[in-house]
Amino acid sequence: MAGSCPFLANIEAQERLSEARYDDGISETFSGGAGLVQVSMVVFDQDGDAPNSAGLSTLFTTFGQFLDHDLVLTPEDHDEGVLDLVGMPHEIARSAVADEIDDGETIAPTNVVTWQIDGSQVYGSTEARMDDLRSFEGGKLRVQDDTTSASEMLPDADEDSFMAGEISGDDPVYLAGDIRANENPNLLSLQTMFVREHNHWADKLAEEHLDWDDEQLYDAARSIVEYELQQITYNEWLPHLVGDAVGEDTGFDTNETGEVSVEFSTAAFRFGHTLVSSSIDRLADDGTDEGSMALMDSYFNHSPVEDSGIEAIIRGQLSATAQELDTEIVDDLNFFLETPEGVSGFSLAAINLARGLDHGLDSYINVRAQLIGDIDPDTLDPTDFSVITSDESVQARLASVYTDVFQVDLWVGGLAEDAIEGTQMGPLFTHIIADQFTRTRVADETFGELDPALGDAIIAEVQTSTFAIIIERNTDVDMVQDDVFIAED
């Protein structure tokens, strides 16, 4: 996939924070673990609704997915073999591995998008994709009229666009910077809104700078959107997740690399799957229900967007509470996940665990010992799961599928940890996520900068543009709460 698609580039090896675990030390997946499907069905089984105790909104969940798609994409490569998940509809191809790894060295999964928070999910990661998205008029991105309102929607993709999802005349796939943009209506609403935000700034800059050409307007508008995404991430979103663990901006560091770590992409930043609720909610401007859709029916389904526009979907995300961040996943993801090709019946939990083996993640205990150093594996009681969590019901679930604590997968153990007070995360996942976002910031020479050429008035407006303000100026959604990541009716 990475070799044939012109819209995937920047192919780099992901970093490793801990030692890789392969049976042969190179690439053969570890064979001593628990049954992946059994773990997914026992540990991650969720019985009913479990609203987030901190009141996080569905928009918090969606922005996390939107952000993830800016940072990392690891394509599959059938030439690398398959992962045979007993109980799943069919096997899954292994991930593409980085070419720069020499023969005999431990493999590393690739990342084919830029690691910076640069809006690549909106603009693309290659010149080909960027050009395909541009109108080349007034610095703006291509859009089409929304048939339900006077607003703008993303352009339709064609068969040469390499977008995930089935492309047909009856149910078009929308074109965006990231190939996964059409995965669900909530995600699609943010993809659309930030294109509108770009065009808002392109228009405003054109009024302020009459002598600027299309290229200047495009570059300036994009730089503003990049800045806004960075500020939302660090000032509004991350504090809810990990508190102040990321710390203050210390400026550019030439000795740091920002490339995404395997522990981040394959374990810690997959926490959001436990936050996902079982429905896509839509609300009218007066707060009345416009009809929800079961999550399992929403995969690559654009009808909610086409029928109601993105406004109703965004209102639903502002109002609805996410699920608890724990070791439970709604059935829609744990039993009825659907692939872009339309194959249903997958378990996202099982796939995540399989990717952990594919990417050579070590166990929770070993990674914790290496990265935090607060435990000594040699002194642990193998049957004492309280070293992971104080929740006795979770301990019992873990003990029913894992032979001992040393067998617990990194993703599972990280989700099971007791959260640090005032955050959503336990110590190990907090460490991994804080490490990533610290490096993402300090390794980016232009992070958080605005070009003085924008003008004082524009800069002042940009610097006060919270997520709530961005929603209000690009949609018909009124009375948006100041903190959009806490649900409000």
What spans do the regions from the language model cover?
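Short, flexible coil/linker elements and helix-boundary hinge sites characteristic
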Residues: H209-L210, L380, Q407
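Short linear, low-complexity motifs centered on an aromatic residue
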Residues: P377-V401
